[in-house]
Design a protein with these regions (language model features):
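Nucleotide-sugar-dependent
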Residues: 31, 81-88, 95-117, 123-135
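Conserved donor-binding/catalytic core segment of Leloir-type glycosyltransferases
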Residues: 13-31, 37-40, 181
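A charged, aromatic-enriched C-terminal amphipathic alpha-helix characteristic of glycosyltransferases
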Residues: 149-155, 162-190
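Conserved donor-binding loops in enzymes that form glycosidic bonds
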Residues: 23-28, 58, 78-79, 175
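Carbohydrate-associated surface elements
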Residues: 1-2
Length: 191
């Protein structure tokens, strides 16, 4: 789960001149970026011109080489304190989450997923559709789950968010807080 205190005083710096998709954390070679790159290439020129893709954290050089050839604005931000990373999340239009393309990846639940949920921004997940991370996103009522290679669906999702056709997030993020989850676990243990 996420720590509610991390979001208490976080700054929001929305930049209306850009449509911001952010990835927060390490992007190593196991994280399949090709689906996202193909989706960005399929976006309309209007969206591509307003698009800012922001990576906060370490990015594998091979992925940077692919991304830098996209012809859109890309920003690489090295390691920042967690509070600053939270501000980047809150200042984004879409948060990109990629599950590593490795065997037995359906059970991967990253801490980043819960922080993204707490940020209450649209999440675009690329990974196993039947995996645990996808199930959490689906339980929140979000539509942003895409299998590796589903670039057309991902591109369509990005366009819908850009055009405000997908906007309202009506889930209660507290169900994914560390405090709530710890309370639930303690009740199970006590019973």
């Amino acid at each position: 789960g996420y720590d509610e205190d991390d979001f208490a005083d976080a700054e929001v710096n929305k930049d209306n001149s850009n449509f911001v998709i952010s990835y927060i954390g390490v992007l190593s070679p196991q994280y399949e970026i090709d689906t996202f790159i193909a989706a960005v290439k399929q976006l309309s020129k209007t969206i591509q011109q307003k698009l800012l893709i922001r990576f906060v954290g370490q990015v594998y050089q091979g992925s940077k080489d692919k991304l830098d050839n996209l012809g859109v604005k890309i920003e690489y931000v090295d390691y920042v304190p967690h509070k600053t990373a939270v501000s980047y999340m809150l200042s984004s239009d879409i948060l990109l989450l990629i599950i590593p393309n490795i065997s037995d990846n359906k059970g991967i639940l990253t801490g980043k997923l819960f922080a993204y949920i707490a940020a209450k921004q649209q999440i675009a997940l690329v990974g196993p559709v039947g995996g645990d991370a996808a199930n959490v996103i689906n339980k929140c009522g979000m539509d942003g789950v895409f299998a590796y290679g589903e670039s057309f669906s991902l591109s369509d999702f990005i366009e819908k968010v850009y055009n405000n056709e997908i906007c309202c997030l009506n889930y209660n993020s507290k169900y994914y807080s560390r405090k709530f989850l710890t309370q639930q676990l303690s009740e199970i243990i006590v019973d």
